[in-house]
């Protein structure tokens, strides 16, 4: 127990190496004391045994032995606790050192990786400035079988390609022009404008009904004279013919005659739809202005028609009027 009591006090260390060396020496001394504790206990037991045999005051020897055994046990437990604490402290310190070393290594690796990425980026930027990138243009193939004629427009097959120089571009432009010349667009029909001298003399807007009045009655029943210059073509459907039915054979005094407007050489020809609309507007008259004789004949023809016959007789009758 004298070795444990005479343990030297650690001196203040100046740097990290001295501190680690001092701690390692203290740990080794603690292990030596723990190893010598067994020999000390055995020597104390032999001493008390001899004293108890040779000494007459055995009661005093027994009391002294009890006190020594208690102190020796307490010192042993204390010594084991201190050694255990030192071992744990040493292990924790080494673990912390390892963790700190790993952290520093990871930081160094991260810095190296960032430096490498920066160097690669700078190298790529420098190479991009040095390298002359080629310019690509569009190339068009114009096979004669795939061109669809549609006026001045043609459907082209677009294929991405590259032109090596200005000569290729000139050849391509000449080929396109030659192809366009080979496939001329279909001719567009233009309206032929005739001079006023070549046109036929137009009829005047005034009408004379003396010839109609002096004509025989049969001819008047067959066909009514149309006051318009361009009469409409008749068809077989009944839905289109009501305008022709409402037209009377003889003009009434209350009905105003709408003359056909004159056309000049510079005026474009009107379409058929415009002419039909104009004639329909001119033919809109109230039904009460029709002559009673014609309505009677129409009613008589409808009543005298047989049921077995078809509507051809009615259509022919309506076509006459």
Swiss-Prot record:
Protein keywords: Cytoplasm, Cytoskeleton
Gene Ontology CC annotation, any one: microtubule cytoskeleton
The protein's role, per its UniProt record: Involved in regulation of actin and microtubule organization. Part of a WAVE complex that activates the Arp2/3 complex.
Composition bias type Low complexity, residue spans: 204-215, 240-255
Subcellular location(s) of the protein: Cytoplasm, Cytoskeleton
Protein name, per record: Protein ABIL3
Domain of life: Eukaryota
Biased composition annotated in UniProt, kind: Basic and acidic residues: 279-288
Name of the gene: ABIL3
Secretion signal, residue range per the UniProt entry: none
Family: Belongs to the ABI family.
Segments of this protein annotated with the region Disordered: 179-273, 279-298
UniProt record, GO biological process: root development; trichome morphogenesis
